[in-house]
């Protein structure tokens, strides 16, 4: 079997940051998959389930309600390894093009004070597993990287 793109990245050298994971074209429409890497893989502790679940709910809701980006958002969700998220958007983008959006998103999560969107038994298959405080904590740590973003945080090793 052919190895998928994300398995060709040397995770031992991967820093937290924002990376273009892949670009796909379907019927002349480009989709860009963004790797929002919050943790250094296999070095830092992974994001706990309740925190990553909360970031997913708040993040997906905020992105789909962002006036500028709402029509471009296809998907926002966690990586199985729990070191970050994937964001799939319509359009041809580079990592640097997404710094402002991702910074805005995680800043909004840090300051989020409303009930967690979609956190009821009718809306979510695991509604009891949320942790807003840890979601804010993980988001604030990631913002420190975003606020001092360097080339090494924007290009895969």
Curated annotation (Swiss-Prot):
* Listed InterPro entries: LuxS_sf, Metalloenz_LuxS/M16, S-ribosylhomocysteinase
Write down a Pfam family by its short name.
LuxS
Q: What is this protein called?
A: S-ribosylhomocysteine lyase
Q: Cofactor note from UniProt?
A: Binds 1 Fe cation per subunit.
What does the UniProt function comment say about this protein? Answer: Involved in the synthesis of autoinducer 2 (AI-2) which is secreted by bacteria and is used to communicate both the cell density and the metabolic potential of the environment. The regulation of gene expression in response to changes in cell density is called quorum sensing. Catalyzes the transformation of S-ribosylhomocysteine (RHC) to homocysteine (HC) and 4,5-dihydroxy-2,3-pentadione (DPD).
Cite the binding residues for Fe cation: 53, 57, 124
Q: Which reaction(s) does its UniProt entry say it catalyses?
A: S-(5-deoxy-D-ribos-5-yl)-L-homocysteine = (S)-4,5-dihydroxypentane-2,3-dione + L-homocysteine
Listed cofactors: Fe cation
Look up the EC number in the record and give it: 4.4.1.21
| Membrane-spanning residues | none
One biological process term from GO is: quorum sensing
Q: Any coiled-coil ranges, and where?
A: none
SUBUNIT field: Homodimer.
Which family is this protein grouped under?
Belongs to the LuxS family.
What are the record keywords, sorted?
Autoinducer synthesis, Iron, Lyase, Metal-binding, Quorum sensing
**GO molecular function, a single term:** iron ion binding
The family database entries (Gene3D superfamilies) matched by this protein are listed as: S-ribosylhomocysteinase (LuxS) (3.30.1360.80)
């Amino acid at each position: 079997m052919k190895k998928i793109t994300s398995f060709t990245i040397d995770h031992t050298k991967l820093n937290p940051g924002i990376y273009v994971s892949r670009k796909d074209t379907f019927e002349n429409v480009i989709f860009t998959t963004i790797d929002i890497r919050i943790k250094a893989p296999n070095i830092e502790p992974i994001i706990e389930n309740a925190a990553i679940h909360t970031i997913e709910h708040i993040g997906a809701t905020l992105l789909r309600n962002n006036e500028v980006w709402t029509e471009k958002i296809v998907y926002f969700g966690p990586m199985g390894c729990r070191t970050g998220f994937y964001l799939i958007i319509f359009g041809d983008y580079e990592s640097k093009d997404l710094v402002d959006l991702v910074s805005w998103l995680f800043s909004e999560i840090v300051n989020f004070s409303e009930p967690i969107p979609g956190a009821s038994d009718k809306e979510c298959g695991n509604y009891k597993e949320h942790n807003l405080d840890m979601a804010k904590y993980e988001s604030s740590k990631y913002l420190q990287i975003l606020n001092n973003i360097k080339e090494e945080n924007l290009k895969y090793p």
